[in-house]
């Protein structure tokens, strides 16, 4: 910690980079809170960028942790709206969101903003039909709205003229060179 404090005070970039590398090497989901606070204190943005990228690229793994369940609605929505998010399927993502919600039902106020970022249009018609039977989905009207929009997309797709929306776009990052 003394090296980090001195490096920050003297603005020795090479030493700060080494400290960032060291913190990144220690970073896990379990200790992220503490290490990210240290990185934030010393403006080690590479550490927070690394952690964000780690979550985005291993999101399915992240959803199995206590740290996922501890996210606020705005934090979760921030990850979900990112096109760099890697998920096995949007259905698996929906199920993870329901686990997150059931962990603390006071999050009902955040559920609309979180579900807004699920790409329901990428689910199959069978998956959408199953979701409409889900008790939680039936009681939360915004979810039904998103599902019905996705069903409309599939109907239009079958006719050959789908209206493309964020809900039907594949998650991908376009790099400019």
Residue ranges and their predicted role:
Residues 1-177:
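Alpha-helical scaffold in the C-terminal half of BTB/POZ domains
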């Amino acid at each position: 910690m003394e090296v980090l404090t001195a490096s920050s005070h003297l603005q020795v970039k090479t030493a700060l980079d080494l400290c960032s590398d060291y913190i990144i090497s220690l970073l896990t989901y379990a200790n992220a809170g503490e290490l990210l606070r240290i990185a934030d204190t010393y403006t080690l943005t590479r550490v927070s960028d690394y952690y964000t990228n780690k979550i985005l690229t291993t999101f399915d793994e992240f959803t199995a942790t206590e740290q996922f369940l501890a996210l606020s609605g705005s934090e979760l929505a921030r990850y979900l709206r990112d096109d760099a998010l890697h998920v096995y399927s949007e259905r698996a993502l929906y199920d993870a969101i329901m686990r997150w919600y059931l962990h603390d039902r006071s999050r009902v106020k955040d559920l609309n903003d979180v579900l807004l970022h699920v790409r329901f249009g990428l689910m199959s018609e069978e998956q959408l039909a199953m979701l409409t039977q889900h008790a939680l989905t039936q009681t939360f009207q915004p979810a039904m709205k998103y599902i019905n929009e996705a069903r409309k997309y599939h109907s239009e797709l079958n006719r050959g003229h789908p209206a493309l929306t964020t809900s039907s776009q594949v998650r991908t990052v376009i790099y400019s060179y």
